[in-house]
Amino acid sequence: PAVPETAGGKPPPRGTASDMGRHKHIHVIRMKKQALVTGATSGIGRATALRLATEGYDVIATGRRSERLESLRREIEAAGGRCTTLTFDVRSEEAVRRNLEPLGRVDLLVNNAGLAAGLEHIDKGDTADWDAMIDTNVKGLLYVTRVITPKMVAAGGGHVFNIGSIAGTEPYENGAVYCASKHAVHAISQAMRADLLASGIKVTEIRPGMVETEFSEVRFHGDKERADRVYDGVEPLTGEDIAEAIAWAAQLPAHMTVNEMVLMPSQQAGAYYTHRKN
């Protein structure tokens, strides 16, 4: 059909009611937010991936145990969510880059991959345990952050959650290297916040106290009986508790940031202060 004319015999300018009427079926497509969670095979990471999926995020879950990641993916998708899994070890910079550089936009990063290994005096510690903790808790976090934050800068914003520990600010006996690794996470989070401030990227450090996960079993190299004694007489936090806190902080308005969250069981006041019921 002929283009309608206005007075003077000229077609109406683009953007008028006549022009817009021809495009009334155009829909604005809003892309879902993407969340990347490291160490998602168990504990805090798994719970966080599930929780963020319920908040409408498309989840990218990473870890070393492919069968557990596949189980997580099935659970998220059965509930109507979307999940992509990537199996690699954050201790390998090459693996981090190979798996994460091809990703597109990442709106939320949860640097959760971490571990404790061993619980001995410094003069008796196993240097292999020390390497595992530093390589995972510090270098792994840095490798992932180095790949993902440029994507956030390019997109004009994002939110990074670093999972630390009260051990990062309350060193305890037999935990020198683990405490040092989490102190590094604390310092990195503070500096990262300053580095990324002008880019509109939020940085939140989560410092939990006692959380019942595989943490203690890994620390004691599979000694479940010894691991279970850590929680004797105490109702610890769960991975779901930490995930709930992350989901809450993630949905705050753009002008508001939670810099740090210290989350404790109600029976724990600090690294050295726990009330155990008989």
What are these regions (language model features)?
Residues 57-71:
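Conserved glycine-rich Rossmann-like NAD(P)H-binding loop of the short-chain dehydrogenase/reductase
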Residues 67, 87-98, 127:
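The beta1-alpha1 cofactor-binding region of Rossmann-like NAD(H)/NADP(H)-dependent oxidoreductases
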Residues 120-122, 126-131:
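Substrate-binding pocket helix/loop in short-chain dehydrogenase/reductase
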Residues 145, 181:
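Active-site helix of classical SDR
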Residues 165:
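Residue(s) in the substrate-gating loop at a strand-loop-helix junction
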Residues 205-206, 213, 224-272:
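C-terminal helical subdomain
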